[in-house]
Amino acid sequence: MRPPKHLLRTSDLDNSQIETILQQAQTYKDMHHRENLKNKTIITIFFENSTRTLSSFEIAAKRLSADVVRLDVSKSSTTKGESMSDTAANLNAMNPSAIIIRHKNAGAGYYLKFQVSCPIINAGDGAHAHPTQALLDLLTLKEHFDNDLNNLKGKKIAIIGDIVNSRVANSNIELLSRFGMEVILVAPPHFLPSTHLRTCYSLREIAKEVDVFMSLRTQTERHDKQIYGSLKDYASQYCLTPEILSDRDVIVLHPGPVHRNIDIDDEVLKDPRCKVLEQVTNGVCVRMAVLEFCICT
């Protein structure tokens, strides 16, 4: 029996596997129903709130004809003191085909993989990693740059905002750097991690040299204290506005949820250069490909 194929971080995949997943995802764009996962059962267990990721995974599974069981954490035995380890062991005893988990603690999926015999797919763990978000972002970039990952080499992407608290940033930094993009981190000092990457405190200073803007939400739920004067003060420096984009050939990404007029201006969200909804569409296709990869290969 082969060991389960987990996806806990982007580094679990080599470049060839990533390219295979993206190619497979693109084949799903015009196909809304396949039977690749018929008679498979997938459990989703989210200890943090989610709109896009949870819905995207469940739609992806159902489009592949899998049965989906959503564990309602608020009604589960974890509220009675059952440990994560025991929860995982009990779920595993039901022989699911995969478990998709989101948790506030970094490394939760890594810990659970030793308790189960099926694939664990990380849907976000604390500020650590969000591999499927990075994969869907990579697909969005691939499609924009003439559907060729080689065209990403040398392109500059500014990741803007609450980087130190962002699992999306961590996963994208690892993945996009691997495919040759130059990553620039743009944020106030207290939002920047210790890094070897180029950093900048001013969005306007680097706006004219980048090809891609990736804005991030300010994750106030991960802040121990107020660390900026106000969201209005923050937006005055880091909100993506029509003035910042100007008439340049750039695109805008955001993992959602978007804080309108704080992360991205209303007018920019309506601009065709803003690819936020394309990211959401790509998310379903990428997660279909990830589920098939982890369960069937």
From Swiss-Prot:
GO CC aspect terms: cytosol
Binding, L-aspartate: K80, R167, R217
Catalytic activities: carbamoyl phosphate + L-aspartate = N-carbamoyl-L-aspartate + phosphate + H(+)
S-S bonds: none
PROSITE patterns tied to this protein: CARBAMOYLTRANSFERASE (PS00097)
Keywords: Pyrimidine biosynthesis, Transferase
Recorded metabolic or biological pathway in which this protein acts: Pyrimidine metabolism; UMP biosynthesis via de novo pathway; (S)-dihydroorotate from bicarbonate: step 2/3
Record: residues binding carbamoyl phosphate: R52, T53, R102, H130, Q133, G256, P257
Molecular function terms, GO-annotated: amino acid binding; aspartate carbamoyltransferase activity
Enzyme Commission no: 2.1.3.2
GO terms classed as biological process: 'de novo' pyrimidine nucleobase biosynthetic process; 'de novo' UMP biosynthetic process; amino acid metabolic process
HAMAP family per record: Asp_carb_tr
Similarity comment: Belongs to the aspartate/ornithine carbamoyltransferase superfamily. ATCase family.
Protein's job: Catalyzes the condensation of carbamoyl phosphate and aspartate to form carbamoyl aspartate and inorganic phosphate, the committed step in the de novo pyrimidine nucleotide biosynthesis pathway.
Complex and partners: Heterododecamer (2C3:3R2) of six catalytic PyrB chains organized as two trimers (C3), and six regulatory PyrI chains organized as three dimers (R2).
Protein name: Aspartate carbamoyltransferase catalytic subunit
Organism annotation: Helicobacter hepaticus (strain ATCC 51449 / 3B1)
